[in-house]
């Protein structure tokens, strides 16, 4: 009976997402509607869809698990970097990008860069699209894998079957409703994620014996409640959290300036003046959600201390919220429905990221590669068909990549984050705020940043020591330096480009 209630809750949730896609399926008249919702999104939807698509399953799985095992330092510094990055992205980039992209009639990030620099050969379009595809496909695969593992661990459902079902639902509402459906479902999913965090937190504190007991337990563990050390659960010791560690975790915030699926939200809002409200909503939600996520890890350890939960070692710590949901479900039908809602929250965290990534990748293939770089003349219907076909193809490849339930596909998430931040971040900032930046500089910056991610990750980082820093930071700096230097040693932009730059101020 308990499993039936949980499954019914999740099924109702998934069917609801498909209905949203169906409702918006008739509102996509052209590619601008499909990719950007016709630039008609309100401030609440813009804010919450951006943050829901940002906060993938790591918010409900990775971050609580990390806090559970190591204390508050690593997740805490990461959260600070992400919170500051979120706020700066909304404050600095959002309004300028909305105005500039609307002036140029750009509907994708690569297209914006191409039009910004009058790239007649569409090299920026092609390079940007390739980068998006290279990093988004495995990123999407990790989302499918999360869904498959969730159903498999809870109900014993075949991993592959569960993953395919999840992919079908995500692909279904995305290809039907496009950006409007994705943004609306992301808003709904952010609410579900919030409810899941609150329910787990309240229940966990109660089972652990109260907040004072949770804090006393955390204080008794070496290095657990300090931002200057990390707790080692294996031998109950503390390890110093170095400046290098802090720099690596804070560097996550730089990734926001280059995230295509987040930048698209800025481009889609109906009125740039409403971005102020969106920024406030997004920033507050991010801080509260990440704080709750870290505290859940601490509370989970308190539950283990109280004997309500077995000790979760290694990667099993990421199933903390799933384990708590299972405990909640034991308290009757209503509790089982609540547990189903919590598990739907994990699905929501995964789906809200995967749908946005697939839409961004589809726009890159249909708009940037086929039409602009490949010079294919497509009607609006043909363009939308190409985008929808691309989404299906990406999902198939993603399912194939994640077909092994023991695969390490989750490891690609931080690498993909670095890939986007290193490739696009500095170039987007230069294109928006530096008039002297030119096509050659943007191309060189994007290419060097993307390559540095691979070089640092696989060649330099294994050397250890100071070289063990997160690859996003050196890639971002390399891209910035190369973009500036190449722009300065090559011809200045034309008067027309400079006039367009001034018009977007």
What are these regions (language model features)?
Residues 1-505:
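Membrane-embedded helix-loop-helix hairpins and adjacent transmembrane boundary segments
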């Amino acid at each position: 009976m308990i499993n039936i209630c949980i499954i019914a809750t999740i099924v109702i949730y998934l069917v609801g997402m498909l209905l949203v896609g169906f409702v918006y399926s008739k509102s996509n008249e052209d590619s601008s509607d499909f990719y950007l919702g016709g630039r008609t999104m309100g401030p609440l939807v813009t804010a919450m869809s951006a943050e829901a698509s940002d906060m993938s399953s790591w918010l409900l799985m990775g971050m609580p698990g990390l806090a559970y095992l190591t204390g508050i330092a690593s997740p805490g510094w990461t959260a600070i970097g992400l919170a500051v990055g979120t706020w700066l992205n909304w404050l600095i980039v959002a309004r300028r990008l909305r105005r500039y992209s609307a002036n140029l009639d750009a509907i994708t990030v690569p297209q914006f860069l191409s039009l910004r620099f009058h790239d007649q050969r569409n090299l920026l379009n092609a390079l940007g699209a390739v980068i998006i595809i290279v990093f988004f496909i495995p990123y999407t695969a990790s989302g499918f894998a999360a869904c498959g593992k969730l159903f498999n661990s809870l109900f014993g459902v075949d991993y592959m079957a569960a993953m395919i079902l999840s992919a079908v639902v995500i692909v279904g509402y995305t290809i039907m409703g496009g950006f409007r459906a994705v943004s609306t479902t992301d808003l709904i999913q952010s609410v579900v994620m919030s409810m899941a965090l609150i329910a787990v937190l309240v229940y966990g504190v109660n089972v652990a014996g109260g907040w004072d007991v949770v804090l006393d337990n955390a204080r008794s563990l070496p290095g657990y409640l300090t931002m200057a050390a990390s707790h080692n659960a294996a031998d109950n010791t503390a390890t110093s959290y170095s400046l290098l560690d802090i720099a690596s975790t804070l560097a996550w915030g730089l990734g926001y300036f280059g995230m295509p699926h987040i930048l698209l939200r800025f481009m889609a809002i109906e009125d740039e003046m409403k971005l102020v409200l969106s920024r406030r909503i997004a920033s507050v939600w991010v801080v509260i959600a990440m704080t709750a996520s870290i505290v859940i890890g601490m509370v989970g350890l308190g539950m283990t201390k109280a004997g309500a939960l077995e000790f979760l070692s290694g990667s099993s710590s990421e199933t903390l919220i799933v384990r708590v949901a299972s405990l909640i479900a034991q308290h009757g039908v209503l509790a089982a429905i609540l547990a189903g809602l919590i598990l739907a929250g994990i699905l929501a965290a995964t789906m809200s990221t995967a749908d946005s990534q697939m839409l961004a990748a589809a726009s890159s293939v249909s708009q940037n590669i086929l039409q602009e770089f490949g010079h294919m003349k497509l009607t609006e219907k043909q363009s939308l068909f190409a985008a929808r076909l691309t989404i299906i193809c990406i999902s198939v490849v993603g399912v194939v990549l994640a077909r092994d339930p023991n695969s390490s596909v989750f490891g690609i998430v931080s690498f993909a984050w670095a890939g986007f931040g290193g490739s696009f971040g500095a170039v987007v900032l230069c294109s928006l705020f530096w008039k002297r930046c030119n096509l050659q500089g943007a191309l060189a910056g994007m290419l060097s940043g993307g390559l540095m991610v691979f070089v640092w990750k696989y060649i330099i980082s294994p050397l250890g020591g100071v070289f063990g820093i997160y690859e996003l930071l050196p890639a971002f700096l390399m891209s910035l330096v190369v973009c500036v230097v190449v722009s300065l040693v090559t011809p200045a932009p034309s008067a027309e480009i400079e006039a367009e730059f001034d018009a977007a101020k």
